[in-house]
Amino acid sequence: MKAIVIGILASLFFAVTFILNRAMELSGGSWLWSSSLRFIFMVPFLCLIVIMRGTFTPLLLEMRKKPFYWIKWSFVGFVLFYAPITFAAAYGPGWLIAGTWQITIVAGVLLSPLFYVKQDMPGGPQLIRQKIPLVSLGTSVIILIGAALIQLQHAESLSGRMLLFSVLPVVIAAFAYPLGNRRMLEEYGGRLDTFQRVLGMTLASLPFWLILAAYGWWSDGLPTASQTVQSFIVAVSSGIIATVLFFWATDMVRDNPQKLAAVEATQSGEVIFALLGEIVLLSGVFPSLLSFAGLFIIIAGMMLHTFASQPRKPKKKAQSNLTA
């Protein structure tokens, strides 16, 4: 239950990404700067935190052992996640991006067979390939249906261009994020803490963000003061607070596929927070009755996930009242 609450809190801070990315695009900011500045701003904060915790040197030692592993999965988990998200914001509204992003809930469940979990066997601990938790898949699909209902009130305004450039990139991001996170969690979940993993992945992906920033400078010039400030807010809110909270929550349940799916499902809260944020901050369209039904289904789906992930208490054997 604690991991799920932390996951919901993370979704609140993640929602800032969808709202501010859309605001930056509406004000003429380049998606290249929106994506790169977030991770560039994250570096000094995370370095300070990890150094103060005295865990910076162990992180560097681990990264030196497998540099290409870090680069590969940091690229998948961070670059293929956030660059498509900011690119999509240039072509579609925040509600569409946040709604499409909910595919990641099902994606995380479907990716389960790619990973292994350590189990105690008669001959000693062994790595067992995970299976798709069908109960979690069912409740994840329920949440996805709720997210789809929220989008229906806006469906008439969608063009083919908007679908191609705003939906497809988010689908790629929806699979890349849990894949990169789980790969790093599988390899370093027991050796590195959450702050170390986030910093390590940020440092490993930094060359790609610097390339995007250089291209943004060449093609669009320097970012505006407004975009810089908003990117800084996204870096702190989503890049540091939300990412650390979410990685912490997944780390707590890394050995239980069903609980891990439940934590990943808490990301559905983003569509709720993003919708409310756009209404309040960007004068977005007020939800219809169908959208409210979608919100209710999302909340119900998260509650089902929470219930399904709780350990079952063994039934006590009935004691016989018969006397000899």
UniProtKB/Swiss-Prot annotation:
Q: How does it sit in the membrane?
A: Multi-pass membrane protein
Keywords associated with the record: Cell membrane, Membrane, Transmembrane, Transmembrane helix
One Gene Ontology term, aspect cellular component: plasma membrane
The compartments listed are:
Cell membrane
InterPro entries from the xrefs? EmrE
- Pfam entry (one): EmrE
Which residue ranges run through the membrane? 5-24, 39-61, 68-90, 95-117, 130-152, 162-179, 199-218, 228-250
Q: What is this protein called?
A: Uncharacterized protein YjlA
Gene symbol of the encoding locus: yjlA
